Every structure is written in C-alpha cells, then in structure tokens.
C-alpha cells in the first residue's frame, strides 16, 4: 500500500509572503488535496538575525487570507536544532561524515588556488580520511558530509525530468557548523524526513540544493521524496519578478483590493494549465491539478490579466460577500478609514444597495471603494474636472426643469424615475444622455458612476433633490 501524500510549505520568516511563495504554497496545497493527503507548514527560522515573529505572523496571515490551510501546528526549524545535531553525529559515527578542522586561512588558500587554476572553489577533502587524533587543540570542528567522488547524483524530478550532477562538482559540504548549528542543506533533509514528507514542490532555484540533499538522504539510508522543481515567476519583460515589476507581497495585493479567490485562480495558471480553462473553482483546481502538468518554462506575471480576472470574480460575487470583503480591507487602503467611519446603519444599507451597480465598473476593491465615495460625500459636492464641464450653463439649464419632474415622482424606484425622466426627455425633444450626464455630475460630482437611476435610489429622494438643488441654484 502506498504512503499517503504529504507535502510541505517551508517559508523563511525574513519578510512578507511574496507572490512566488504564495504560488508554491498553492501548488503544495492543491496537490495534497488532489491526492487526499496533507500539507504541512514549517517555518525555516534558523537565521536568527533576520527571522522575526512579525514576518512569521504575516506569512500565516497571508496563507489564511488566500484560503490555504495547513494540517497540524506550524513547525519551527530552529527548535529542532538538537535533532539536526543528532543526525549529523550519527552520520559521523557511521563513517558517512567527518569532523573538519580546516582553518579559515586554509579555506581561503583553497579558494585562491582554485581561482588561479580557473576552477570553481571546492573544499579539497583534507580532513576526509585523517585520523581525528591529529585534530589541533582548542579548535571546534565543523561536520562535513562524505560526498561521493565518482559518478553522478541524479535528481528524479517530476517537472524537470532526471537532472544529473557530476559528483566531482559536489564537494564535501558542511552539514553542522562549528557552533553546533545546522546548515540549511542539512536541516531541511532531517525535517522533511521526520515530518514524513513524500513530495517536495518548490522553486527551481533549489535544484542544485536537491542534489546535495539527495546525498544526505542516501547517506542516512532514507527514502528521497518525489521532487518537483517549478519554474520561477518572471515579469512581463521576461526578467525575474522583482520590486520594479510592481507589488510582490500577498499583503500588497490584499491592500490593492484583490479577492483571494481571484488571486488563487490567477496564480494556479502561472506555470500550470488545464486545457483552455481560464476561470476555475477551487474544487475544479483540486480535481484537475497534477505536478506532471506543470510547465518547465518560466511563467510571466501579467498585472492586467490579474485585474481582469479579479473584475470577473467581483462581478460574479454575491453582493453581501463583496460588501463584507470591502469592509474588511478598508483599514488597509488609502481613504478607507474615512469610508469605514461613514458606515453607520444607513450608510451600510446604502452601500449594499449600490453594490450591483458599483461592482460592474470596478476591477478591484479599491476601485469599488472609490466608486462608492459619492454616497458619503458632503454637500455641496466637490466636482471633478469632467463633472464641472458637464455642469456648465447649458448643463444647468437642462437640469433645472428636471428638479420638479423628480420632485413629483410618487414611488422613488429606479423604474418610476426612469419612466419620469424618459417622458420629460421626450417632451423636451432631448436624448436621454443629454439629461443623464449633467444629472449624474450633480448627484456624484463625477462623470462616471453606476446607472443614474440606481444612484437616485441609493441616495434617496431628499439627498438627491438637495444635490441637484445645489447645482441649479
């Protein structure tokens, strides 16, 4: 019987959860769900100077916001240091690793010699077979793995295929430093083994690490997990995604106003596809996702495409769910605090009533919030440039007879208002747009908004007439 699939996401808490890490977490999560397995979370916090609790919290928060849950408690790599030392000592006892007492001066000499001979710097193995009795007094050794010197180490990769590394290029690397702390290379192997990880899905910048880690697995006689090294994400210009391409952290995308479901949908398509399907539910992703379908080539991040997908998700969202998502993100967006303060019971009801019209025009929650500002604007409204041009003498003249028409409307509904304005336009020999444009400007201070009859309903009779009155004098 085959083992249950166990994947892991193992971020370093030295900063935010970046977009590449989010995609790696998503792929691990989807594959575990697809196989009926588990995804574990390990915080690789061995770099004590750079690791922070705030960064750990931000990573956990980012994963939770994206809807990526993990099984069990998050594991701290730093807290497992005694176990890492134990395995390193076991390797020495079994003749698979050794104490190295080479001084910094000796190591520098090796590097200089390699440079002079035009070869990559490599440790020359001088302590590999020496008798420990020759150890210099008072020197704390490092522990180095006894890497094979002949042949090659093969990484069997589900995405890249078999990747071969000549063993002559893989020196006896350090697994335990002289202060007793493990190297990243060693700690990762011990943790993955002890956690029962069966499948490792990570960026292809770890491919060379995979060869060295395979050597440690083999030295311990442990099964090597199935590796899948996925291509990195590049910007639209083909260069590795960096700050100059725009937002990098998941928290930034949240603050910009993307929906987690839309970001998930966009990320899953970066390097993986299912036919021509662009939009897919989480259930479909889980059903269809398989590492063997991940592309070898780098995926390009396209902000416009993400925005289009987010807009589609917003338009298809339930109004109440979108309202809740907007309210949740208000503290994080520019101008959001003022909008949040305006959301008393009446304001909340108005915003929810406006949602069908607002979401048709917005591609992000920030745009949605901006579109909703007219509801809470103080009178007299500040007009933007286009609105001011619509409310010139001609526009005000068109608007003046509209006031009594609206005042006379009995039932203040979009249908009744539409009928009244259309009848007035016909009687005056005007096209509807000739009235709707200055009317919209007077009601919202802008030239664009949801449908003008919807705006009238959201604002209500009293506020609508007052705003029109301000403009016609």
From Swiss-Prot:
Primary location group: cytoplasm
InterPro entries: aa-tRNA-synth_I_cd-bd (IPR045462), aa-tRNA-synth_I_codon-bd_sub2 (IPR020751), aa-tRNA-synth_I_CS (IPR001412), aa_tRNA-synth_I_cd-bd_sf (IPR008925), Glu-tRNA-ligase_bac/mito (IPR004527), Glu/Gln-tRNA-synth (IPR000924), Glu/Gln-tRNA-synth_Ib_cat-dom (IPR020058), GluQ/Sye (IPR049940)
Matches recorded under PROSITE patterns: AA_TRNA_LIGASE_I
Motif ('KMSKS' region): 240-244
Gene Ontology terms: biological process: glutamyl-tRNA aminoacylation
Compartmental location: Cytoplasm
A Pfam family: Anticodon_2
Keyword list, A-Z: Aminoacyl-tRNA synthetase, ATP-binding, Cytoplasm, Ligase, Nucleotide-binding, Protein biosynthesis
EC number: 6.1.1.17
The family this protein is said to belong to: Belongs to the class-I aminoacyl-tRNA synthetase family. Glutamate--tRNA ligase type 1 subfamily.
The protein's role, per its UniProt record: Catalyzes the attachment of glutamate to tRNA(Glu) in a two-step reaction: glutamate is first activated by ATP to form Glu-AMP and then transferred to the acceptor end of tRNA(Glu).
Name of this chain's protein: Glutamate--tRNA ligase 2
Species for this entry: Brucella abortus (strain 2308)
């Amino acid at each position: 019987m085959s083992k249950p699939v166990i994947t892991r996401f193992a971020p370093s808490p030295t900063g935010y959860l970046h977009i590449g890490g989010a995609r790696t977490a998503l792929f691990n999560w989807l594959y575990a769900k697809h196989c009926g397995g588990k995804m574990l979370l390990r915080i690789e916090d061995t770099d004590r100077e750079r690791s922070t609790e705030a960064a750990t919290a931000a990573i956990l928060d980012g994963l939770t916001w994206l809807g990526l849950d993990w099984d069990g408690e998050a594991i701290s790599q730093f807290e497992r240091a005694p176990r890492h030392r134990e395995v390193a000592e076991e390797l020495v006892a079994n003749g698979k690793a050794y104490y190295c007492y080479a001084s910094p001066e000796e190591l520098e000499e090796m590097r200089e010699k390699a440079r002079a001979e035009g070869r990559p710097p490599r440790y020359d193995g001088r302590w590999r077979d020496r008798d420990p009795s020759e150890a210099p007094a008072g020197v704390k050794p490092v522990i180095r793995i006894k890497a094979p010197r002949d042949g090659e180490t093969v990484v069997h990769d589900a995405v890249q295929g078999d990747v071969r590394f000549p063993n002559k290029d893989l020196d006896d690397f350090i697994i335990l430093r002289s202060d007793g702390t493990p190297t990243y290379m060693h700690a990762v192997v011990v943790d993955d083994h002890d956690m029962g990880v069966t499948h490792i899905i990570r960026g292809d910048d770890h491919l060379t690490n995979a060869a060295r880690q395979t050597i440690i697995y083999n030295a311990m006689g442990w099964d090597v997990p199935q590796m899948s090294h996925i291509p990195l994400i590049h910007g639209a210009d083909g260069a590795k995604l960096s700050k100059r391409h725009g937002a990098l952290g998941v928290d930034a995308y949240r603050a910009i106003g993307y929906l987690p479901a839309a970001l998930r949908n966009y990320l899953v398509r970066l390097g993986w596809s299912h036919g021509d399907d662009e939009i897919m539910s989480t259930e479909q992703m889980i059903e269809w996702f398989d590492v063997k379908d991940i592309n070898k080539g780098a995926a390009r991040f396209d902000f416009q495409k993400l925005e289009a997908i987010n807009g589609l998700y917003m338009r298809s969202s339930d109004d109440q769910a979108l309202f809740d998502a907007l309210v949740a993100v208000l503290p994080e967006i520019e101008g959001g605090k003022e909008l949040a303060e305006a959301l008393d019971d009446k304001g909340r009801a108005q915003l929810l009533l406006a949602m069908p019209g607002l979401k048709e025009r917005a591609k992000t929650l920030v745009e949605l919030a901006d579109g909703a500002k007219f509801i809470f604007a103080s009178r007299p409204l500040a007009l933007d440039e286009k609105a001011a041009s619509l409310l010139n003498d001609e526009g005000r003249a068109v608007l003046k007879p509209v006031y009594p028409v609206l005042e006379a409307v009995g039932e203040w509904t979009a249908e009744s208002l539409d009928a009244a304005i259309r009848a007035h336009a016909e009687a005056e020999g005007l096209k509807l747009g000739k009235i709707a444009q200055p009317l919209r400007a007077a009601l919202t201070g802008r030239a664009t908004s949801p449908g003008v009859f919807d705006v009238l309903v959201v604002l209500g009779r009293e506020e609508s007439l007052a705003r029109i009155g301000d403009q016609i004098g």
